[in-house]
Every structure is written in structure tokens, then in C-alpha cells.
């Protein structure tokens, strides 16, 4: 209410004065400005790319262009403020104590917010209060809880282009974790895009020269990301400066100590991130310590299409967690565990040893139900110490944050005891990684008041008995307050006013309140201060003296308590690495317990993961679908290998379950490679280096692409990037164009995928082109499967079983009937089908002799024939082959 009244008063004050409506640089005359406005413009000139929150009393105020932007984005009243000129400066403001929600809204929209605080006490300032920027908040540097999703990392990325290639750095400023990789200069666009999509950063740092160096990469960043792209000076990516920053931050002289060549693109990207965090943080310290240097060979490749189609972390339709694989697997108890299990899902492993380590830990937790239950109970009380410790380092942590650290650390010994008898290596390593930090727990418990307020500047945060000076001042204040009680009793007796009260407020300080019925008894030494409806308020010289003494003591103790607290906070910050190591261990334990619990509850099995190249699944189930349907899920087998069963052609009607089955197989492979148990009776999974999917139909109207063009673009990317160790999920290739075009493309793609001379990858290939089933007898490694259907008269029942052989019909009319198409339409469709069948249909005929002369007697046929004869299939890339096919089809249609 007070804040609203202040804004209304400011708005009323603007009447009669014109508000400046133009850009400040063009219209403001510095010589005419007030001292505070000169100070504002000086600070603003150093932060032109940010909205400046300028602290004035209990408000953050914005002026000029910033005021206009903020009023529009935050729905604030745009008013004006005297600035020394004839016109008033545009102004809007928000209460400082509720600033986080406003900052969050601006940051969400991609703005940077510079926080300018009063860095000296206004009470002691002789002239203008000194102000300075204490922090710049950007989408990628947020550390405030209110602006973060506890279950997601908030990554800041940097892209460094150097002569040796491109370096990528992904850092979560709120947790301190940092991931670093690089790619060679000859082919990095697709790899960079995959990593950016995997980490989904909120902000991307790039050099000013990026657009000139790589127009394709710049265009990709602009078109495919909601992330804010922040351009930085080219020298921010200078590896020489990176080394200086490393020395400053890590206390080492050589980047090589962490396995990073100091002239590499990785070093340049890391340096850009660290420099930016120091620049925006303004505290002289940051929480980045955990640097993970990785290569793309460590993790399964998952491109944007696969991440979307497999619905790993969110559904395609609603973009929500519910209905995704993460929704099924995430039973974690800590925020740190929630972030880690998401990371595991997005980065399946390619190292069998690491996979087995996770499997062994999950198996032990599955078998020891009591241990798992007790660990889970302990983890339920663990707070997000990763992010709390970052606040400690940035000096924004409150006393309550330190109490949360202590409360969490009290559970560490119990968790270590539960793991003390663990058999598997991973659980033993977790046990060793949990540091009880007893001395920090003792310090916090001894020093911090359990009932401490949120603010660290208002006192009452240091526990009694911890500091003698604090106790002494509190005693002095207490005696002052007891003296006030004595005054009240004495004045009641002296004046005979039984209702007399001695009270305090921030406006008048200490005062005596007398009701109207006793005003005739007020003595002459009372000084009238305020008249209210039912009473009047008075002060005396004695009260003012007590007030000066008490308030002076209050100021002293608030400052003293803050200094003591700040010292304790620095001691806690010094143990950052210990807390981060413990947080990492707890997150891993939480994730393993979650996966073990889900495995037990959902009857998952431990898969055999090896290098055989086989995918053999017995009674596999879709982990998400089986949780949401009301009827029992129909399990299916899958057999793929590198010899006779590389490619499975799957036919059958729509709605029968082909897409579910194909996604289910891909998800089981992915689950196995994160070390998770899988929904099947048994499974052997040969490592897959990538999963590629082409599922469903969608237009990209914004890019001017039809459903068919989107489909072909995705297929081209798959054929370009897949290897023989990849798993391909290809659903209805070619359905977006005419029947014969589509069938030709589908066959060409399947031949390319199945043939070992071109690719030879494992694939599930669903199609409505039943003519393609002939390929089982023509191409080694291709097998036919179909979705079993039971037909009675005109009715069909989907059995959801995948069985060998091609489908005996498309059942399109029957499916249309099930979907509710009017009976008259169904009857007409049957008539048309019968007529077509009676008149004969054109079937696909395999060309057995590639050298035979085709009967092309129409005009222009010789040109097409010549083109065919001159094509060198061995030198064409997949995308060139696709383009050539399009051109020939177009030419044929024009004849």
C-alpha cells in the first residue's frame, strides 16, 4: 500500500511539468542536471546494454529510455522526476524488497538488469550518497531461486572460433559446473548445433566477428534459439587473456594442468565465460570450479529431431514434463538429483565400463530395499547446496541460507553410514565423496540465530553468547527498553492518566499517547507532536534522550552483526570445493536411487550392454505409454543385428501401434546406455553411437517449408550423419508427396540405409507402401514385420503385436470407420476401392536387370536416360542423391 501511494504521489507531482519523451543522449544537457541525475547518467553510460535499477531510498528507480522500456514490459506507471531541467525525466519505480519478480520478468524477456545500490549509509553521507553497480543480472548469470527452475540447469554458453576449430563452453553460474569441448574447423556446424540443443543455454556469448567468420552458424543461432545472443569484443576470446583469468581464478599458471591447450578454442571459450562472470558478478569471485572437458565420442548423438520425437524431457504437444520419459524416471528427492537425471537422459554413454558401474549401483539398490528406503528418507531433507553455495560465494546468501547448509550437512554422517557397507565401486566412491564438513556445521550452529530474519542488515542474526560485544550492546538496549516501562508507570502515577502509553514508530520515534478523555491532565512539559481522532501524541526531552541512546545502539549492533555474519559467510565460501564435491556425490546417489526405485516398481530388467551390434529385446514395453493407458500394455520383441536383421520394414494400419513400437525400441536403447534398467523381460543392447528419428508430419510455415520439405530435410541430415553403429527410426518416408514419388524415395532411402556399401545401419522402417516388402528377397539384411490385426466382417481389432511378414492389407477404410467417419462416406470409399481393384492397380516392380533398356519413347526421355547413365553413384552424398532425384522427377513430369 505504501509503495502504491508513493507512486501515486509521484504521478500527481508530474502535473504541470512536461516529461522528456526523447532519447536522453540527444536531449539531456548535463550542465543543467541535478547532482543525482548526473550520477545516474555517468553510471548508465557504463552499462548501456542493461536496464539500470537505481536505488533511491526504498525504491529502485529507472529513468529516461530505461523507464519507458520497464513501464512497457512490467506494466508500471510511467511518471516523471525533477532532474534539474525544465522538463521532468521519465521515471518509473519498484519497491526494493519486491524487485526479484520484476527482474525475473525482464530477464525472461532477454534483458540485462544492472543493480545500482547505495554503497554508503545515507545517514552518514555528507553530500550525494555514493552509488555503484553491485551486479549485472543476465539470462545466463541468474543465481536467484525465484528466477530459476530447481530441476533444470541454467546454462551460459560461449562459442569461440579459432584457426583450429570451434570451442564450446557451457557453464551454470548458479551451480558452478562447467562443460568444455571443441570440434575441428572442417566440419563443426552440425556438431555445434547438437551440443547447443542438448544444453539449451539461456544466453550465448559470441565474438563480434562471428557473423563474418561463419554466416551459417550465426543464422542457426538466430533462427533456432530463444536464447539471448550477447556479442562480446573479439579480445574477450583471446587465449592469452584466458590464461590470465585462469591464473586469477584457479591459482595455477598453466591451462594444461586441466588438460586444456592454452592456445586452443576450448581455452578461448572458457576464458570468455569466466571473464563475463567476473564482469557481471562484481564480487571478485565466482563459483566455477568443476570443469568437465569432454568429447562428442563420450556420448550418444541425439539431434534436435530425436530429442523432440522421443519426448525425453517434455512432450511434443504440451511441452510439459508429464508424459515424457523424465516424468517416468524422475523420483529424485533433491533439486541436484533432478538436474542430474535430466542430464543423464540427454547424454547417454558410449563407454561400457561407465554403463556397468551405474548398472551395478542400481542393482545393489534394487536388491537392498531397506538401504534404499533409508537413503531416500535422508535425501528428502537435503537442500540445494549447489545453488546455496553459489549465493554464498556471490555474497547474496542470507543467514537462513547458512542455516539450510547446516541442516543439510547434519544428514551427511547418516548417509555415509548407510553406504559404509556398499559392495559396488560406484556406491563406495559416493560414500567417500560425501564430506561431513563438521567444522562448518559447528560454526553455523554456534553463531547463527535459528530464528534469523531474511535481511542480513537488520540485526538479530547472531546467536546470543557467540560474541561478547553483541551481547553487551543487546544488554544496553534491553535496559533502555525496560527503562521505557519504568517511565510509562511513573508518568501514569504522576499524571493520573491510567491509559497513558509509551510507544514507538519509525516516523516519530518514542512518544507518549494520551486518549482524548484525559487531555486535560496532560502536564506542561509534554510537547504535542501529533493529533489523531481519538488521542494525541506527545514527546519529552527525557524520551528523546533515551531514543538517541537506543537507536544509536541499534545502528551499532546491526552493523556489528552484519560484519560478523559476513566473516562467517566468507569462511563457508572458502570451502566451496568441498561442498561442490559433496553435492555431486549426493546428486548421483539420488539419481541412482530414483532409477532403482522405478526399476523395482515397474518391473524393469538389467540389460546386457556390449559391442555386439545386436538389439535383442524380449517383451519390450514403452515406459511412458504403459503408465498412462488403462489397459494392459502389449509387449513386443525386437531383433536387430548387423547381419540378416539390420532393417525391419514394418507395415500395418494407422493407429495399430507402429510408431509406439519404434519409439519404444529407441527409448529402451537409450535407457540402457544411461545405465538404467529397461522395461522388458530381457535385453541385449549393442552400443549405438546415435539415434536418429524421422517420425510424424509437421510444417515449418515460418521457414516456408512444407511437410514434405521438412521430412526430406530431416532424412537428408540423417543420411549425412548416421554411421553403421547408429539406430534409425524412419516412419512413413515419402508420404508427403505423390504415391510414385514417395514410393521411389522410400525405396531409395531404405536401400541406402540397408546396404553395407553405403551405410549398413540398424533401422526400423515403417511404411504404407506394401510394394516395399518385396525388398526382403532382394536386399540382404532386410526383414518384414507387421502389426497383427484381427478382422471380423467389416470390423477390425488391433492386437498391437509385431509379427514377422508383411501386412495383408492397409485397412485404411476400417481405420476411418473406427475414427468416426460418417457411414455414407465409408460406403462410398468401399465402392471406390472395389472399382479400383477391378480395373487393376499399378504395382511396384523391381528392376532385376539394371542394364535393360527402358521403353522411354516420349519426347525428352533421352535426356533423362543420359542423366541416369552419367551418374556416378559412388561419389554422390545422400543429400546430392536426393536433389538429383528431385530434379529428374521434375523433368519427367514436364514431358
Per-region residue spans from a language model:
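Amphipathic heptad-repeat alpha-helical coiled-coil/stalk segments that mediate oligomerization
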Residues: 165, 234-247, 300-301, 312, ...
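Charged catalytic and DNA/RNA-contacting regions of genome-maintenance
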Residues: 17, 25-364, 377-380, 384-393, ...
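ATPase nucleotide-binding head domains, primarily ABC-like/P-loop NTPase cores
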Residues: 64-67, 263, 333-334, 339, ...
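Active-site phosphate-binding and catalytic loops of NTP-dependent enzymes
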Residues: 116, 139-148, 284, 420-426, ...
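Compositionally biased low-complexity segments, especially N-terminal hydrophobic helices
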Residues: 2-14
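Terminal-proximal interaction/regulatory segments of ATP-powered molecular machines
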Residues: 505, 869-895
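Conserved catalytic alpha/beta cores of large enzymes that bind or transform nucleotide phosphates
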Residues: 196, 201-212, 219, 542-575, ...
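Charged, surface-exposed helical/loop "interaction arms" that form contiguous linear patches used
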Residues: 394, 398, 408-411, 464-465, ...
